[in-house]
């Protein structure tokens, strides 16, 4: 759906790279705008269907929303730079460009904070199987409020940021 046709009425959460909405309790949550640059479906190696069907096709580096549009933003970008062209992990999680991922993620953080309201919450998820989370956090000047490691070998990081009011004042 084009951004100009999408109503934000009742929408309080932006998932800026939703993929197949894997961690969502309700994959059709009416409070959320599900955005991704991909819209595709695949049959995985075990026969399961993988469907990436966002409400809005948009790149997380150039979100089509006004500043301060959402009180909650979810940012779970692709975390793999080494994955085969037909590999199931690339289909499921997306793929980073080896040359540009730092700039893309830096811009993604900036966009997340731009569309986030003052005192809003950014939920950031990263799996450091290939790229250490320390390299990712260095791409934003914002400081996390909460940081939790989960998953196999504690490689998945859930990092919560709270946007300060001063960030909005700087943008004005």
Q: What annotation goes with each model-predicted range?
A:
Residues 1-172:
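Class I S-adenosyl-L-methionine-dependent methyltransferase catalytic core
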